[in-house]
Amino acid sequence: MIETPTVTLEEDGIIFVDFRSLLVTLDLLYDGLNQQRALAPKKKSKVLLVGQAATKVDTDMIEFGACAETVQLTAAVAIVPLSKIGWILANLFMPLQRNPYPTRAFDTIEEGREWLLSLDAG
């Protein structure tokens, strides 16, 4: 069985994507997006991504956030890296990302959630 991120629609309306110990890949991002679509079809959601680190930060990973499928379903993204390497990769990713919605990295899940809830609905 292939492991996938756990994706839940929280009571506050945030889509919580938990990669746990999985290394984030483009395929896993698309899996999470498909689960998001199933939970909140045709709705732009605020997304809280939590994980250890990505396998790499390449053009495909950077462009994922700006692709039509992702933009159609996403109002904002808070990223919470759970490891030092995750923070390094997030710092590399943030200046390169071309997301047409707010995207920020946070130290804690609580900080990411507070920021998402402070934004106007998308």
Question: Where are the predicted features?
Answer:
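Amphipathic, Lys/Arg-enriched alpha-helical "gate/interface" segment within cytosolic domains
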Residues: 1-122
